Design a protein with these regions (language model features):
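One-carbon transfer enzymes
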Residues: 3-226
């Protein structure tokens, strides 16, 4: 009789554990996207979520450090909660980051995506969210990256150097600008008639908008599986 009760206890324990695992797998990883400008990469993430490319996570918050950023309109159209955090109003980098942390914690955010976020985050911040912050950079790191390399300047440098191939990289963020572990890269060939502007648009379309959603899904899926 005791053996029967023992088997029953084991059976119930297995059922409970499986139920916990199913609930964990069903729960989406909560994503925050930090922006500063037009939000084209944010839109790529929203589109990917709508198409089911990003299925392990959900964009739950958009934070901008620029009050007039069009990315905020994109968030509004997609019914995603948003907030504006202005460093000049808070007075210091520390206060600026504390406010961002407050918003992230309030929304129970799991991972952070920097999508054209034009502000360097401190070592304290990046360590707090170690392996939880993703950034997309418009070159094949380690080329044309680090301090001073952002936006159109990256593509100007690639053309000035005369390289034949460029691309984009998604990487984890640490205290070194563009120095974190690489998650995914995609190459784009440079044309003879390219200008910085045409190259920027093609790198966005052929690389950034492809590998950023794919990387976000990869990280979310891995986080859910833990």
């Amino acid at each position: 009789m005791r053996y029967i009760f023992f088997l029953l206890d084991v059976f119930i324990a297995v059922i409970i554990e499986n139920a916990k695992r199913r609930r964990k797998m069903a729960k989406s990883v909560k994503i925050a996207v930090l922006v500063s400008g037009g939000g084209t990469n944010l839109q790529a993430l929203i589109n990917a979520q709508n198409k089911g490319i990003i299925k392990s996570g959900k964009i739950s918050l958009v934070i901008s450090n620029v009050a007039t950023a069009y990315a905020l309109k994109r968030a509004e159209k997609a019914n995603i909660p948003s907030a504006v955090v202005l460093k000049k109003e808070l007075g210091s980098q520390e206060a600026f980051e504390e406010k961002i942390v407050e918003l992230l914690e309030k929304s129970n955010i799991d991972i952070i995506v920097l999508a054209g976020f034009m502000s360097i985050l401190s070592e304290n911040f990046t360590r707090r969210y170690d392996k939880r912050i993703l950034n997309v950079h418009p070159s094949l790191i380690p080329s044309f990256c680090g301090k001073g390399f952002y936006g159109l300047r990256v593509h100007e440098a690639a053309l000035e150097k005369g390289v034949k191939v460029t691309g984009a990289t998604v990487h984890f963020v640490n205290e070194i600008p563009d120095g974190g572990e690489i998650i995914m890269q995609k190459a784009v060939y440079i044309r003879e008639d390219d200008t910085p502007e045409t190259l920027q648009k093609r790198v966005m379309k052929l690389a950034e908008w492809k590998i950023l959603p794919a990387s976000v899904e990869k990280v979310c899926a891995e986080r859910k599986a833990k």
